[in-house]
Amino acid sequence: MNTEVLGVIAQIVLMVVLSYPLGKYIAKVYKGEKTWSDFMKPVERVMFKLSGINPNEEMNWKQFLRALLVVNLFWFLWGMVLLVTQGVLPLNPDGNVGQTAHQAFNTCISFMVNCNLQHYSGESGLTYFTQLFVIMLFQFITAATGMAAMAGIMKALAAKTTQTIGNFWNYLVLSCTRVLLPLSLVVGFILIVQGTPMGFDGKMKVTTMEGATQYVSQGPTAAIVPIKQLGTNGGGYFGVNSSHPLENPTYFANMVECWSILIIPMAMAFAFGFYLKRKKLGYSIYGVMLFAYLVGVCINVSQEMGGNPRIDEMGIAQDNGAMEGKEIRLGSAATALWSITTTVTSNGSVNGMHDSTMPLSGMMEMLNMQINTWFGGVGVGWMNYFTFIIIAVFISGLMVGRTPEFLGHKVEAREMKIASIVALLHPFIILVGTALAAYLFVHAPAFVESEGGWLNNPGYHGLSEMLYEYTSCAANNGSGFEGLGDNTWFWNYSCGIVLILGRFVPIVGQVAIAGILAKKKFIPESAGTLQTDTVTFGVMTFAVIFIVAALSFFPVHALSTIAEHLSL
């Protein structure tokens, strides 16, 4: 047990220590300063020339958003065509068939919004061609989209008064070539050394210890897993994600993959401080996020290492903790750490089954996604926190009788309305979706039965499964309580709608707020200026997040996860 705890501590220390220099590097990349990766400039110039794009052309916030939305629409259409027709495309040695229209709709939107919700099993639901030219492609593009949006916001906030927020295409390419690609190559090499397969052979025929014949999928796993983790994507190459021994072969590989989930979201908080030359503000934001993350880690590690009371009642020893749904080679503590790491971000990959974690662990996993501001997805996680900064600044200003200001710009009714809509949309789409599913399950049993029954675990846990699904979609996370039968017409389409709303409405709102603030007259700091880089303001922001985001969900948790915990 002590060794497992030391492993958890070592992983967290590595994340914290390495996120600082990475954040400094990312800030330099977006500011156009000299870095070690400048050797990529010729490649970038060729890409821009072939695309007919001038990377130095400035965009206002509306042009920036137009480019972002148009390119995502194009990739959605691209993905839909390939997923439906994958059965007749090359690189399909196992003969996997094309996806149905509603499954392709869900899959394509899911990967386009950086969620990677999977209503299919990775090795049988896709071909090598679509793994590379839809899944891996989207995992780079969507991660870079979030990072580009944050870069635009940073540029807007760094300027005293400006009409433009940078060039979306430039930020998109820089995010891929300077950050995501180099880190993916390093992580991919480590995984190959640890035993993750990399090739295009078909299924491998093996004889098990019992003498039976089994066919094991292989493919370009080591190419896809790194960006799956680093881009907070999370979509597993194999159906059981990183609990699969070929996707996550060893404890060291597990450490590297877990580190990969959080390193860029952590670094982005530091990058904000370096970009704006307000390191203290970056430290403050990072500190609040880290505190919330560590609280979750402590709760889940304690819950999972403590074992299941029901098994204790049977007189069965649980020296290794609650091991249902976990891998022996990884242990309960490493699985608990991963469960929090993957849900404080929009990653959603798993190295054990969240459906089998203890009820309070499941509640923490859902609360992380329901709050959706602790580190979050690459770029968009900080942007969600930015929404609550605007709300906290406005409330704080009213409380002390000062005009609300953030970084020298007045926060007025227009920005507050946008921030409020963004903040309230998240709980709204989660709770409405869950309520609709619960209503249909009770009042339309014939429809539910025609779709396979949906729930394998009715009662408290069944409600938790439906709540988790919509929570994961709205937070663009992608993990799930897999007792839910979700590859159906209803779940594919309803989740697809929640995915779109949960991704693009916040991005549009947050970029709009930054663009509107940037155009306002700059107000120099004075003795009456609200200091946003203090511990006091950090606590205020934490309180606003907890009240607005977390408390909205406690009634439904009382009927699901908490009720299940009390029934043990």
Curated annotation (Swiss-Prot):
It comes from the Bacteria. GO terms for molecular function: P-type potassium transmembrane transporter activity; potassium ion binding. Pfam families: KdpA. It is a multi-pass membrane protein. Keywords: Cell inner membrane, Cell membrane, Ion transport, Membrane, Potassium, Potassium transport, Transmembrane, Transmembrane helix, Transport. The chain crosses the membrane at residues 3-23, 68-88, 133-153, 180-200, 256-276, 281-301, 375-395, 421-441, 497-517, 535-555. InterPro entries: KdpA (IPR004623). It is found in: Cell inner membrane. GO terms for cellular component: plasma membrane. Part of the high-affinity ATP-driven potassium transport (or Kdp) system, which catalyzes the hydrolysis of ATP coupled with the electrogenic transport of potassium into the cytoplasm. This subunit binds the periplasmic potassium ions and delivers the ions to the membrane domain of KdpB through an intramembrane tunnel. The system is composed of three essential subunits: KdpA, KdpB and KdpC. NCBIfam families: kdpA. HAMAP family: KdpA. Belongs to the KdpA family. This is Potassium-transporting ATPase potassium-binding subunit. It comes from Phocaeicola vulgatus (strain ATCC 8482 / DSM 1447 / JCM 5826 / CCUG 4940 / NBRC 14291 / NCTC 11154).
